[in-house]
A protein has these predicted regions:
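Conserved nucleotide-binding/hydrolysis modules and their immediate coupling elements
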Residues: 159-161, 166-263, 301
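Residue-level signature of catalytic and energy-coupling elements of molecular machines
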Residues: 11, 25, 33, 46, ...
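Charged, conformationally dynamic linker/hinge segments
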Residues: 252-348
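Gly-rich Lys/Arg/Thr-decorated short loops/hinges at beta-loop-alpha junctions or inter-strand turns
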Residues: 3-7, 27-33, 107-111, 256-268
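Active-site phosphate-binding and catalytic loops of NTP-dependent enzymes
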Residues: 18, 86-91, 122-123, 159-169, ...
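Inter-motif core of Ras-like GTPase G domains
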Residues: 19-40
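P-loop NTPase catalytic nucleotide-binding module
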Residues: 38-180, 201, 233
């Protein structure tokens, strides 16, 4: 809560190995805050994330962090951002007004006309241009030293607006997780209408009742009787919904852009039943469909698909913590997307 605005924050992993999880979250955002390291500048992964934000049409603010240890100037950092698009505008308080409005005017014809007529650009026009992804506001600071944070929050309060919501129920599932008691939690964003406890939700070939609606803040939560449009909540009682599913009038998320690039074979220690290990991995796959867990009956092998070593370590840790299974994996191999489909003849 800041000023008169209440924000629901969805933090996503910054490491490239968890890009698929980040992508799933983008489909439920009203706005995104893209954090860039001032000490490292624009990285390839920054460009990948910005392309994903473009694909999902998410209005985007930028916070350039670690300016207390930055080796690059503001001008150099803004130059790096502008290589991804022209309309990254410095919203810092120290920017001269004429320079600020000049930059905004170059981003849309409407703002250009208003600037030429009045010498300024009203907040409503700026807000609309941000919503339409014509402008990407940039703020500078240091999260560690709390520098620039109030300025950023004030900018979010001033230049964001609640998007229009319909009356008929719609929701988008973005995460599946089990609570400490083993209850399956279906995390969703209510995109329109309202969800009430005991409402029956329908999916592809299934219909299940929402037993409980939880609003989480960290590890703590409170139960509510209903969740209105715009709210992010976790619902118990659903067993068939998966990340990316659309409920009610909401369409499902498009096929993900980012897919695993490596395949690993599970190495089971002596005495561990393969089917028990498969069941555990299937539960992890329920939360992360990109794992693509497969079982080869002939070879008695389990294979999973991952983005890299960091994600592999997390999977091993989850298997040990949640299921008591100390499972190893082989060196892994590249997932080739092309293969020979017919007879070929070598010459030479």
């Amino acid at each position: 809560l800041y000023g008169d605005c209440e924000f629901t924050l969805r933090d996503t992993p910054g490491h490239v190995d968890f890009s698929a999880e980040t992508e799933r979250t983008l489909s439920v955002l009203d706005y995104a805050l893209l954090v860039v390291s001032g000490s490292e500048g624009i990285q390839p992964h920054t460009e990948t994330l910005f392309k994903l934000l473009c694909r999902y049409s998410v209005p985007t603010f930028v916070f350039i962090n670690k300016m207390d240890i930055a080796h690059l100037s503001r001008q150099e950092l803004m130059g790096g951002l502008k290589k991804m698009g022209d309309c990254f505008i410095d919203f810092s308080a120290g920017v001269p007004k004429e320079e600020f409005y000049d930059g905004l005017a170059m981003c849309s014809e409407d703002m250009m006309e208003q600037y030429l007529d009045t010498g300024t650009v009203p907040a409503d026009a700026i807000r609309q241009s941000i919503r339409q992804r014509q402008v990407f506001p940039c703020f500078f600071g240091s999260a560690l030293k709390l520098e620039g944070i109030k300025e950023l929050l004030a900018g979010l309060e001033e230049y964001t607006a609640e998007p229009p919501r319909g009356d008929e129920f719609g929701a988008r599932v973005f995460k599946i997780f089990d609570d400490p008691q083993g209850a399956r939690l279906t995390h969703m964003k209510i995109t329109s209408g309202c969800l009430k406890v005991k409402d029956v939700l329908h999916g592809s070939g299934w219909a299940e009742k929402a037993d409980q609606i939880r609003i989480y803040s960290g590890a703590k939560y409170q139960t509510v009787d209903q969740a209105p449009a715009g709210m992010v909540c976790a619902v118990t009682g659903l067993t068939a919904a998966h990340p990316g599913d659309g409920l009610g009038v909401e369409a499902g998320a498009p096929s993900p852009v980012l897919e695993p690039v490596l395949a690993y074979r599970a190495v089971l220690p002596e005495g561990v039943d393969a089917h028990k290990a498969l069941s555990a991995l299937r539960k992890l796959e329920d939360a992360d469909p990109a794992l693509h867990v497969t079982w080869n009956e002939g070879l008695q092998e389990i294979r999973v698909q991952l983005m890299g070593e960091v994600q592999l370590e997390i999977v091993q840790s989850l298997l040990k913590e949640r299921f008591g299974l100390d499972i190893g994996f082989d060196q892994g191999g590249i997932l080739y997307k092309e293969t020979i489909t017919s007879t070929v003849e070598g010459v030479g």
